[in-house]
Amino acid sequence: MLLSDRDIRAELASGRVTIDPFDPAMIQPSSIDVRLDKYFRVFENHRYPHIDPAVEQPDLTRLVETEGDEPFILHPGEFVLASTYEVIALPDDLAGRLEGKSSLGRLGLLTHSTAGWIDPGFTGHVTLELSNVATLPIKLWPGMKIGQLCLFRTSSPAEHPYGSPVYGSRYQGQRGPTPSRSWQNFHRTKI
């Protein structure tokens, strides 16, 4: 069940959901707007001949921080990692879904490639997978609205929420845009 603005306010007031920093003006009818932080991970395309999800590639990305009040420029065809300004914490019976903002999508900005799902129990900044599919560069201003977080109540609390040792939870407590850790539990079925 998708939570309404009333339910979102109640979950925040009870402390079961935390969003830090929280601005009540970010609550929408069935979501909470989230803002862009000032840190970005750019890909160092010259470091490796290819990307291999089975192998640790520590120099694949480099952290960039915008200067002062300057925007980050995302060029056509570019892909970077960024993160929400807010730290989000969910209880064991609420899951989240991060969606892009319609107004930004209409400019050619994709907020996430595939990883918009947030499991019950997650705590941390949400890493964004930003792509510019437009034909002109897009200015990304730290602090701008970048997406909206929808919250869903699960049919029952998760037996092993995100962060429990059962699943590995590679991104629990992440701070800033976090590079892929796929190599830590890479799975491949022999075919």
From Swiss-Prot:
Residues annotated as binding dCTP: K101, S102, S103, L104, G105, R106, D119, T127, L128, E129, Q148, Y162, Q174
Keyword terms, alphabetized: Hydrolase, Nucleotide metabolism, Nucleotide-binding
Residues flagged as site, Important for bifunctional activity: G116, W117
N-terminal signal peptide: none
Reactions catalysed: dCTP + 2 H2O = dUMP + NH4(+) + diphosphate
Pathway: Pyrimidine metabolism; dUMP biosynthesis; dUMP from dCTP: step 1/1
Molecular-function annotations in GO: dCTP deaminase (dUMP-forming) activity; dCTP deaminase activity; nucleotide binding
Enzyme Commission no: 3.5.4.30
Protein's UniProt keywords contain Ribosomal protein: no
Segments of skewed composition (Polar residues): 171-191
Biological process terms in GO annotation: dUMP biosynthetic process; dUTP biosynthetic process; nucleobase-containing small molecule interconversion
CDD domains found in the cross-reference section: trimeric_dUTPase
Primary enzyme class: hydrolase
Record's keyword annotation contains Cell wall biogenesis/degradation: no
Region (Disordered), start-end ranges: 163-191
Active site, renumbered: E129 (proton donor/acceptor)
Family: Belongs to the dCTP deaminase family.
SUBUNIT field: Homotrimer.
Role noted for this protein: Bifunctional enzyme that catalyzes both the deamination of dCTP to dUTP and the hydrolysis of dUTP to dUMP without releasing the toxic dUTP intermediate.
Family annotation (PANTHER family): DCTP DEAMINASE (PTHR42680:SF3)
Protein name: dCTP deaminase, dUMP-forming
Species whose genome carries this gene: Acidothermus cellulolyticus (strain ATCC 43068 / DSM 8971 / 11B)
Lineage: Bacteria, Bacillati, Actinomycetota, Actinomycetes, Acidothermales
